[in-house]
Each structure stands twice: as C-alpha cells, then as structure tokens.
C-alpha cells in the first residue's frame, strides 16, 4: 500500500469517528457542522466544530497555521483551539473547539448599541485580531470581520470563522481570490489591491460603527448615522479614519486603532460630549 493511499484511508477513518449533531452552515465552498467524537466503546466527547472547504477554493489555510503553532506550544487567548486538519477526497477538513458564548451580533441586539458597550468589548475584539497579525510571521489577515464572527463569553472575546483568512504576501499586488462580507470589507478586498493589516483595520472600524449604532454599515452614511446616535465627536473621528478608502489614510495597525479608541473614550468622558449608555452589559452569563 503506497503512502498516498494510506493517508487517504487514515483521513477517512478520522472523518468517520464523528457524529454530526447539527449542520450550522452549508454553502457552495464551505460546510460547518457541530459534531461529537465517538469512541470505540460508544462514549462521546464534544461538542466540536468541523468545517469542510473545497480544496480548489484555497480556503481554510489559516487553520493549519494555527494548528502548527499550537502544536509547537503557542497559546492564544482569543482563537479557538484547533484539534485536527486533514483532507478527504476533494475537501479539506478542520476540527476545532466549539467556542461557548453568544455572537457579538446577539450581544448588541440584546444590550442595545452604546459607547459603553463598545468600551467594554471593542478592546477585546482588537486584541483578537492582533493575535492574527502579530503572533504569525507573515501575519494572518482575517478578511471577514463582522459581528457574527466573534463570540463573547462574559467580557472575553474570541474570533471565529477563519475560512477566508489569508497569509500576507509581500510580493503580491492583489488578492488571488475575492471573498468577504461587502458591508464590512474594504475596497482592496474586491480588486483594488492586496489585503494587509490595514484591511482588517477598515473592517474593525465598520464593526465599531455597528457596536455604536447597530446598523449595517453604508460607507456614505456613516458620519450622519454616528451623529444621529449622539456618538461623541472624538469617537466619530476614530471610526471615520479607520474606514478611509485609501489604506494609507487609515490607522496603520490594529494596535494604533485600539490606542486611538482608548484615547477617544478618555477624552469623551472628560468633555462636554455626553456618553449615552445602553442597558448594563449582561448577556446572561455568570
């Protein structure tokens, strides 16, 4: 038996030892399941998340980089633990931790948008993306930052769904494939140039807007919406700089964005701008 056939058989065996509890997403290029590992004696462990990606789409590579880093001893505060990556036929599969909590979208819906909510959660969101940018060389660019791709448990924030994340290529001029959620994705993600750390800065600016207004971002109406929601002017400026069309005009790193956000909160609290707080942050988790 040659090595390639043995690898295929091993992958099939690994794939078949899970029981599918629920299909969470089933798209053309990706399928996401909640699964339980079934032992030889019938006992179960889990739940876990299993994702399948079309091999030809070139998706899911970030998971393997994270798995390799974790196997070498790296520990991440804001990323799910990856347990396995393997190929089955024309698909790549990844099995990972099922992160507890609620999505950021659900938290905003339940608590209502406010500066106070942004103050509590946005720093953790930035820290999560910083792990992708700063703990990997070359950095991982998430490319699909949006409220449904962050999980919140208490005040802890985890970034999930790294399917279209890519490794930055200093020699490339554009992304080979164009994916992402249009309301949050920067112009360069759809053919204007290569995505880099500043592309995630743009998406984080859109996500900050959502935390403040709970509206789907429309780039031409952001300034007006921020004013309508009584967002302090210094914080509006942070959002507007983050979502600049030209990457050179944005904050040049997520850390720079996070520092500007912290400073704007401090200034707003000391100024005559009123911080309008929503309901106390409570997502029902002790």
Spans of model-derived segments:
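ATP-binding glycine-rich loop module of kinase domains
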Residues: 28-64
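Short beta-strand micro-motifs within the conserved protein kinase catalytic domain, predominantly
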Residues: 81-91
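Conserved short submotifs of the Hanks-type protein kinase catalytic core
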Residues: 89-103
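Protein kinase catalytic-loop region centered on the HRD/HxD motif
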Residues: 127-140
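Conserved activation segment of eukaryotic-like protein kinases, specifically the C-terminal portion
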Residues: 174-188
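Conserved catalytic-loop aspartate of Hanks-type protein kinases
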Residues: 200
